[in-house]
Amino acid sequence: MTGRVTSVRGPVLDIRVEGPLPAIGDVVEVGSLPVVAEIQAHLGAADVRAIALHSTQGIARGETVRTTGGPLRVPTGPAVLGRLLDVAGRPADLGPPIPAGAPRAPILHPAPPLAAQDARFQVFSTGIKVLDLLAPLAQGGKTAMFGGAGVGKTVLVMELIRAMVSGYDGISVFAGVGERSREGHEMLGEMKASGVLDRTVLVYGQMNEPPGARWRVPLTALTIAEGFRDGEGRNVLLLIDNVFRFVQAGAEVSGLLGRMPSRVGYQPTLETEVAALQERIASVGRASVTAIEAVYVPADDFTDPAVTAISAHVDSTVVLSRQLAAEGIYPAIDPLATTSVLLDPAVVGEEHARVAGRLKEAIEHYHELRDVIALLGIEELGREEQLMVGRARKLQRFLTQPFFVAAAYTGMEGRSVPVAETVQGCAAILGGECDDWDEGSLYMIGTLAEARAREEARRRKGAA
């Protein structure tokens, strides 16, 4: 079927169709490029309204429109590995075209039925001490990383990609949603340099692209991830940076379509759109899609409707703290605000859960005493409280570590630490084994054995 463009208002296209109307969610191709647009409303017996997924520059009234008969279909499978794609699955890396025979799948379809999903909790080990100890990630689950601008979300996402490739022989699919083009270019270059690009698919809808592209890019990336899970039986790590921009793009689309906004100007379908994305992320059979979602928190306001809508769907919540980043604690993960449903003795074991609980108690007690220390000095505290404060500060520094993906900037080789060694190290600090150590010996290291060697070297140097 064909039609003609009758109105162009930015990314909004009104189209008169010859024949039966295309269904809501179907895509049409406009012009010779072609520009892909998704049907969003039926205006009359022969008129529809669509949101363009590409720039409409050069599109005019009277332009020819071709219907496709279904939702947007994107390529999946081995043909897309190592490639940078746009929202429609077209190469954006100046490489060769995707082979015509590559399998394709629609980006709009229901979540897997409940009976097919694997609800068992299996831990995804990252080698990042603070995550594995305090916020174990679930295979087939969803983790949200909340934080404002400049606190380290993107670096943490890249380190998790490296962990999936090196530790699980898995595939990573990265969705760049509404972020800076410069950051996307840097990530592509760093992945090439680190050797993980051939096991990764990048799907970008950057901030300079129309709202329709930014709105649908997470679904394109998720569809590619589902293709590896269902078609190849591979474990997939889906990383979305930034899922808040997906919500923001949905609000733009809603406004362009003339819908009445809801609280704080968000779209009235906010909860529905977030759920449609999140509920498709699951384990099916022996393979899983595990999602790590960076969430920008506007003005550091965790009561923002978009933030609360996203947090309702996740298994683990990782909160990045601007104060910790200012103190040089990296990764700047707040141990008190970070939570996970997997931090349960039945899942991680009694010792792990006990040490994590004691660590949180120690750091919380230290935070309660910080004002007193700032006013009167630590000498005014009792002996036991001084020891507890010292241990809490040492625990904070022990949970820092250099990342592999940041080695070029920090000059420090990355570390990946098994969770058993993390638990053992924290237990030793809580038990007083490191009370007479310098805090610097525990900063930016891997295991406690490495910290012990650094402390012994410091003492030898002091004795000399």
Swiss-Prot record:
It is a peripheral membrane protein. SMART domains: AAA (SM00382). Its EC number is 7.1.2.2. GO terms for molecular function: ATP binding; ATP hydrolysis activity; proton-transporting ATP synthase activity, rotational mechanism. ATP binds at residues 147-154. CDD domains: ATP-synt_F1_beta_C (cd18110), ATP-synt_F1_beta_N (cd18115), F1-ATPase_beta_CD (cd01133). It is found in: Cell inner membrane. One of its GO terms (cellular component) is proton-transporting ATP synthase complex. Keywords: ATP synthesis, ATP-binding, Cell inner membrane, Cell membrane, CF(1), Hydrogen ion transport, Ion transport, Membrane, Nucleotide-binding, Plasmid, Translocase, Transport. It catalyses: ATP + H2O + 4 H(+)(in) = ADP + phosphate + 5 H(+)(out). Produces ATP from ADP in the presence of a proton gradient across the membrane. The catalytic sites are hosted primarily by the beta subunits. F-type ATPases have 2 components, CF(1) - the catalytic core - and CF(0) - the membrane proton channel. CF(1) has five subunits: alpha(3), beta(3), gamma(1), delta(1), epsilon(1). CF(0) has four main subunits: a(1), b(1), b'(1) and c(9-12). Belongs to the ATPase alpha/beta chains family. This is ATP synthase subunit beta 2. It comes from Cereibacter sphaeroides (strain ATCC 17023 / DSM 158 / JCM 6121 / CCUG 31486 / LMG 2827 / NBRC 12203 / NCIMB 8253 / ATH 2.4.1.) (Rhodobacter sphaeroides). The lineage of its organism: Bacteria, Pseudomonadati, Pseudomonadota, Alphaproteobacteria, Rhodobacterales.
